Amino acid sequence: YEVAPHQDSNVILTPTAALTKNLYNNLIDERIITVSPQSPLNAFKIDSKDFPNVFYIYKVTYLLNLSFPDNKQDLFEKILNPCYYSSEHANEALELWKKIAVAECIEYLEYQLTKVGFQFASGDKTYKMFEILLNDFSVSQIYGIIWKAVADASKLYLEKRFNKNHAANTVIGACTRYAERAKDNGWNLTSYNRIKDLPQSTLSWFYFYRVLDIGNMGFTVPPTSV
């Protein structure tokens, strides 16, 4: 069975480009998917001495490297309606929940900053900050923290107190400070909804609704236990 090139798909696979790349690299490294010989030539670096082993991961066609039972319908049924989760895998399950949650926070942060014309490159500091916030707050609550921090940064710029870069760089610190105040004072932060411009990714939906079977709680509850 073939998997079409990612660049030809309209599917939002994960919340961020970094997580999508990580997902593909893991599937390739574990040989769950392998490059199809029917992939288009421009999917490879044809001038490389390692051709055809050097390729563009989003341009090639893949083959599912799975052992198919006689009744393939059973396999597809298992994939679409999985029973993967068990208490012995709770730590791994929680770790993936956190990764998806951090990615959704980064996605919303970058969206809000772009909306007000700020340029910002999320890095390790941003990732770690959201990891810490998720110990106490859900993604839906962190949406609100982000919205407030970006609004405050935009105000600083519009009042000509900071330039765009300086204003954008205040956002991470503002998120941290507001979250700490909320925690120390026991504030019940408002839970925001997902927005139409950022629909839930396929990975997020499948993991929360099919694997963990917690539905929207993956968005509205902090990822502290499964």
Regions found by a protein language model. Name each.
Residues 1-226:
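Basic, alpha-helical nucleic-acid-binding regions used in initiation and control of genome expression
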